[in-house]
Amino acid sequence: MGPLASWARLIVSISCLTILVGCRFSYSETRRWPSPDNQLDAVEVSAALGVLSVSSSLHRNIYIVKSGEPWLGGSHVASFQFPKGAQQVQLSAVWSSPSELTLRSSGAREAGLNSREISVGTRVVRLALEAVP
């Protein structure tokens, strides 16, 4: 192997390391849906993978928290996986009562509830998942 091949391998190795170091996950609160009695919030949190300042949305999570509290300490109730570059992706949460929450999604490749019921403080919230065309 000549000196040119060694330099080429070194450049490729440095490029790969730069890409790996430039990758990072970031999580951000996208929106909140307050319950009818304003005691709880359903919170959408988006996770993105940033690579050299280009990010693509990977998935969205739903948490239920006491009204106004940060999502990080909340109860994780659902995950949605969306195809890369999907344009018509919709996700919404509809409270039909202070103890019933329906999560609606369109364009999700995978969606799953962690549970059908969850306790938040002294309240039990029933959950439903609905696919929207």
Regions found by a protein language model. Give the residues of each.
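Acidic, small-residue rich beta-repeat scaffolds with periodic aromatic anchors
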Residues: G22-R24, A78-P133
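Sec-dependent bacterial lipoprotein signal peptides
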Residues: M1-V21
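Generic domain-boundary/flexible-linker signal
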Residues: S53, G73, G112-N114
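Glycine-rich catalytic cores of cysteine/serine-nucleophile enzymes that process amide/ester linkages
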Residues: K66-F82
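N-terminal export/targeting and maturation segments
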Residues: C23-W71
